[in-house]
Every structure is written in structure tokens, then in C-alpha cells.
Amino acid sequence: MRELKRTLACPSIYARAAALDMVESVSADATVRKEQWQLTGTVEVYGNKSRVAVEVSQPEENRSELHIKMLSPAANLSADGQNRVLLFLADGIEQLLENTFAQGNKEERIG
């Protein structure tokens, strides 16, 4: 089973929201198990449908651990293809977080 782990510089509440947004954008059946906060769904990435699990934990304040597992890869999806799916999801989650925090730091001046 392929998996990817990534450390994110934010509290888990933000990482979980970004993970949910990202998975829902490429999945029709995303579900969250709230006890351990595990998100599962069948995602369609590059035309291939694979089942994944996403978990977010917070080992320290303002730091989250993102863990994405390939539960059931698309038929005939190579190991490299599976890695690309995991990277696509992790990069998308990280991009959503960057956009969120960049907008929060944005100043506007009128006049």
C-alpha cells in the first residue's frame, strides 16, 4: 500500500478543512470518520479512479501531519501513477492552505 506523509505549518483545523475541500473536488463519495478524523473517498485524478484515505493529526501547536494512503488504486495504475495521485492530492491541499494564509495576510489600500 502506497502512502505519503507531509508536515504542514498550520493547526490541524486548517489542514483538515483543506483536505476535505481537495478530496471533495475530485471525489463523489468522500466520507469522514470523526473519531480519528479519517477522510476516505474514491478520487478521480488524471482520469483514474482510486480509493484513498487522508488523515490529519496535530503533534505540536501550529504543525500538522498529513498522511495520505492509497487504499485501492485504479486498475492497471503503475506504482509511479499511484505516487502521482498521492502527490496531486498533497500538493493540492498545501496549495489551498497557502492561498488561505496569503489572503489572510493581504492588505488593501484604497485612495
Segments the model singles out, each with a brief description of its role:
Residues 1-111:
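Ser/Thr-rich, low-complexity intrinsically disordered terminal regions
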